[in-house]
Curated annotation (Swiss-Prot):
Keywords: Ribonucleoprotein, Ribosomal protein, RNA-binding, rRNA-binding, tRNA-binding. PROSITE patterns: RIBOSOMAL_S13_1, RIBOSOMAL_S13_2. GO terms for cellular component: cytosol; small ribosomal subunit. Pfam families: Ribosomal_S13. Located at the top of the head of the 30S subunit, it contacts several helices of the 16S rRNA. In the 70S ribosome it contacts the 23S rRNA (bridge B1a) and protein L5 of the 50S subunit (bridge B1b), connecting the 2 subunits; these bridges are implicated in subunit movement. Contacts the tRNAs in the A and P-sites. The keyword Ribosomal protein applies. InterPro entries: Rbsml_uS13_C (IPR027437), Ribosomal_uS13 (IPR001892), Ribosomal_uS13-like_H2TH (IPR010979), Ribosomal_uS13_bac-type (IPR019980), Ribosomal_uS13_CS (IPR018269). GO terms for molecular function: rRNA binding; structural constituent of ribosome; tRNA binding. The keyword RNA-binding applies. This is Small ribosomal subunit protein uS13. Residues 99-122 are annotated as: Disordered. GO terms for biological process: translation. Part of the 30S ribosomal subunit. Forms a loose heterodimer with protein S19. Forms two bridges to the 50S subunit in the 70S ribosome.
Length: 122
């Protein structure tokens, strides 16, 4: 099992699919990485040489923000919005949808389970 960016990559999958197990790398970025390193997309992880794994690791470290650094960046951006007190920050603080969705009905994922209202029993 190859270890890239602190993640164990599955050995029997194709390289493009295996790279998507890293947080911050999707299908498009995985294909870009394979293109820059010069690895065919059909090659499987267990067929890679140690030098190719090192090349992939260096390309990811050099060009992309992944795993813990990416998570930290996103949380710092949200914290910055909350500290500014802008509308989006207030929505994050209250735990409501941020991007303009309706909240009269729905939005249960963001708001949490429904709270019982007294006087609604039959």
């Amino acid at each position: 099992m190859a270890r890239i960016a602190g993640v164990n990559i599955p050995t029997n999958k194709r390289v493009v699919i295996a790279l998507t197990y890293i947080h911050g790398i999707g299908n498009t970025k995985a294909k870009e990485i394979c293109g820059t390193v010069g690895i065919p997309a059909e090659r499987r992880v267990n067929e890679l040489t140690d030098a190719e794994v090192i090349q992939i690791r260096e390309a990811i470290d050099r060009d992309y923000l992944v795993e813990g650094d990416l998570r930290r960046e996103v949380s710092m951006n949200i914290k910055r919005l909350m500290d500014l007190g802008c509308y989006r920050g207030l929505r994050h603080r209250k735990g409501l949808p941020v991007r303009g969705q309706r909240t009269h009905t729905n939005a249960r994922t963001r708001k949490g389970p429904a709270k019982a209202i007294a006087g609604k029993k039959k």
